[in-house]
């Protein structure tokens, strides 16, 4: 089972290798039973867990429970952030890798972490058109990721944010973004840079 479709490293090779390594370790462990294609649909008192596999119900009673729900992206608040075309980066990666769906033609990425850079490289490798990356930080934690995007001639707007998602009259989806420099906490510059795009990915 794979819940995350994120890229883990610059070359995009680490995730599959790590997944296979962990799967092998778990499957070979004498005290671990792996139940695939199963659903735990509740968590009752005293750690009673009904687990459904196909047409069979397993009544599991555990001493301890660990819920590994995975990581998640946090959306960014700005004007018109509920327009169609504004989407979490992880959702785009899932659409692309699981369903082979291209969400749009021109993509802008708004990020506050290095995952945004890794996602941009994922999209470029898949043949998608990344027109810009907007980073709310002044510098990327991993300089190599910034360098990789610059080498592919992707404009990177550092220390900036999306002030507003733009749309044309009577067209209720993203047609561009208004990018502004962050000048202090909670305050942005009055000077704006407008970038045409039909998808805005957020990874913060």
Give residue ranges: language-model regions:
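Residues forming the flavin
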Residues: 1-204
């Amino acid at each position: 089972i794979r819940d995350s479709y994120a890229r883990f490293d610059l070359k995009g090779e680490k995730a599959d290798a790590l997944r296979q390594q962990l799967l092998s370790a778990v499957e070979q462990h004498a005290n671990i039973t792996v139940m695939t294609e199963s659903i735990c649909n509740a968590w009752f008192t005293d750690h009673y867990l009904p687990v459904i596999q196909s047409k069979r119900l397993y009544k599991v009673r555990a001493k301890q429970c660990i819920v590994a729900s995975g990581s998640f992206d946090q959306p960014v608040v700005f004007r018109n952030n509920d327009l169609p075309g504004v989407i979490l980066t992880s959702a785009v990666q899932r659409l692309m890798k699981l369903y082979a769906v291209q969400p749009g033609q021109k993509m802008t990425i708004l990020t506050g972490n290095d995952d945004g850079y890794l996602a941009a490289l994922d999209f470029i490798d898949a043949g998608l058109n990344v027109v810009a990356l907007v980073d709310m930080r002044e510098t990327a934690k991993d300089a190599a990721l910034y360098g990789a995007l610059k080498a592919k001639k992707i404009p990177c707007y550092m220390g900036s944010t999306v002030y507003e998602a733009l749309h044309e009259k009577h067209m209720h989806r993203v047609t561009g973004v208004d990018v502004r420099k962050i000048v202090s906490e909670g305050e942005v510059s009055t000077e704006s840079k407008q970038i045409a795009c039909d998808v805005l990915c957020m990874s913060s």
